[in-house]
């Protein structure tokens, strides 16, 4: 559902599904997927990621632990719209364990639709747009200064976890070698 609605509403974007699949030989934790997301964002392989976990909170926290990643928790259409307009981050996390029966699926679709309804970073409310845009820029500057370089970060992690995330990245995006990514 996540891929279907992202593809439907992110009309001007190339949408790639690199999620976890039932037929994969390897299982990935949300922490490992967050590391993969950090690699994809920091290597400019993707500009934006829509992801999640059971609660959405764990993935949001894991993603925000990655240098260069600004992830918002967007359980509702209003949250998605406000994150896109005010915070202008590069990842959103949804609570995928919510009851995606008819009403849950409807909420998921409305959330994705609201996320991509306008270009990101326009500010909200519009009367406060200039201030909101400046605040989002300051937040990104503070985050960048408070974290280490992504390559240094990778070198401090468990090499097996990094290797596992790189393996998924290479397979998902048909990358040739490590020269294309950290």
How would you name each of these model-derived features?
Residues 1-14:
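Glycine-rich phosphate/diphosphate-binding loop of Rossmann-like nucleotide-binding domains
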Residues 12-27:
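A short beta-strand-loop structural module common to alpha/beta enzyme folds
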Residues 20-21, 74-80, 96-99:
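Short, acidic/turn-prone active-site loops that include or flank metal/cofactor-
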Residues 30-48:
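Short, structured active-site "lid" loops
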Residues 46-52, 71:
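A short, small-residue-rich loop immediately preceding and capping a beta-strand
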Residues 53-58, 99:
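Gly/Ser/Thr-rich loops at beta-strand to alpha-helix junctions
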Residues 58-71, 75-79:
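Short Gly/Thr/Asp-enriched flexible loops that form oxyanion-binding sites at enzyme active sites
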Residues 81-181:
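C-terminal binding/interaction regions
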């Amino acid at each position: 559902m996540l891929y279907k609605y992202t593809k439907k509403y992110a009309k001007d974007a190339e949408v790639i599904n690199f999620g976890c699949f039932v037929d994969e030989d390897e299982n990935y934790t949300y922490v490992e997927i967050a590391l993969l997301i950090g690699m994809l964002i920091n290597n400019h392989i993707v500009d934006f990621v829509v992801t999640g976990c059971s609660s959405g909170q764990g993935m949001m926290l894991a993603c925000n632990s990655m240098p260069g990643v600004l992830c918002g928790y967007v359980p509702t259409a209003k949250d998605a719209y406000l994150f896109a307009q005010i915070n202008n981050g590069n990842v959103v996390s949804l609570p995928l364990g919510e009851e995606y029966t008819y009403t849950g699926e409807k909420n998921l679709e409305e959330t994705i639709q609201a996320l991509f309804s306008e270009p990101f970073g326009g500010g909200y409310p519009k009367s406060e747009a200039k201030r909101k845009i400046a605040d989002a820029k300051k937040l990104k500057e503070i985050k960048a200064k408070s974290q280490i370089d992504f390559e240094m970060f990778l070198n401090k992690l468990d090499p097996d976890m990094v290797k596992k995330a790189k393996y998924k990245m290479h397979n998902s995006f048909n990358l040739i070698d490590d020269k294309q990514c950290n």
